[in-house]
A protein has these predicted regions:
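Non-heme di-metal
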Residues: 1-251
Length: 251
């Protein structure tokens, strides 16, 4: 159990009012289950151990979040019953690609929350290592994809590429549904994409995307240059910046 700092009244109100805690706890719990279930099917001992560590860290993130909401009296909706996925590889890929999206925006939002003072320094210090672990998770995942693709039989590759495509379609469809739920006042599952407004910041969309790109590069820079980096989301973000780059604020 972490010794959570006592926050000022305004800071505590800001933190407890964020519409993310239910889904954050549930997402980490589900991610831990998906990753650990896939690890059980991996025959290589070293790779299995690495994936198990990934799953352990996902579950640890869940406990950190659960301790936070308990410490600050945040009410959570009851968690659903999680069942082991029937297709462990699909579940692992959904979790991995989903984290590639969410972590990219989370890097920028965390930076914005830190710089604007929305997150008090005490919480920044607590969560910065968690954010760094998410960077390592997505780096591990995209290199697993490359390794898995290279080592599978040629006849399996078309099926695998279709599976990758299906995962992306699923994630896009899921986020479209999330956006609809948010507009109807439900819990904000898509906070990592819509979070600038929730943070009460006057950062415009172009500025937020630019921060996300810079923070994504910074978080991944310390790792071996031979390792592959997530490319799709940063690539799309850079294209978006050509059209909606940071706007100059009027005096």
């Amino acid at each position: 159990m972490l010794d959570w700092p006592k926050l000022g009244e305004e800071a505590e109100k800001r933190i407890t009012a964020l519409p993310i805690w239910d889904i954050a706890v549930q997402t980490e719990n589900r991610a831990g289950l998906n990753v650990c279930t896939y690890a059980e099917s991996v025959p290589d001992p070293l790779l299995r151990k690495a994936i198990e560590l990934n799953g352990f860290e996902e579950r640890r993130h869940r406990h950190v979040l659960a301790n936070l909401v308990e410490a600050y009296g945040i009410k959570l909706a009851p968690e659903p019953v999680y069942e082991k996925p029937k297709d462990p590889e699909w579940a692992f890929m959904v979790t991995g690609y989903s984290e590639c999206i969410d972590s990219f925006f989370a890097f920028g939002l965390f930076k914005a929350a830190k710089d604007t003072g929305y997150f008090p320094p005490e919480l920044v210090q607590t969560f910065d290592p968690v954010v760094n672990e998410e960077a390592r998770h997505i780096l591990f995942f995209v290199n697993w994809v490359a390794w898995h693709r290279r080592n599978m039989p040629l006849w399996r590759r078309p099926y695998f590429e279709l599976k990758v495509f299906a995962v992306w379609i699923f994630l896009i469809y899921e986020r479209m549904g999330i956006a609809s739920d948010v507009s109807n006042g439900q819990q904000d599952n898509n906070f990592t994409v819509t979070g600038a407004e929730q943070l009460g910041s006057d950062i415009n969309v172009g500025e937020l995307i630019a921060i996300c790109v810079a923070e994504n590069d910074r978080r991944l820079k310390p790792y071996d240059v031979r390792l592959k980096r997530p490319r799709f989301v940063p690539f799309m973000a850079r294209i978006a910046l050509k059209f909606i780059g940071p706007k100059k604020k009027t005096a």
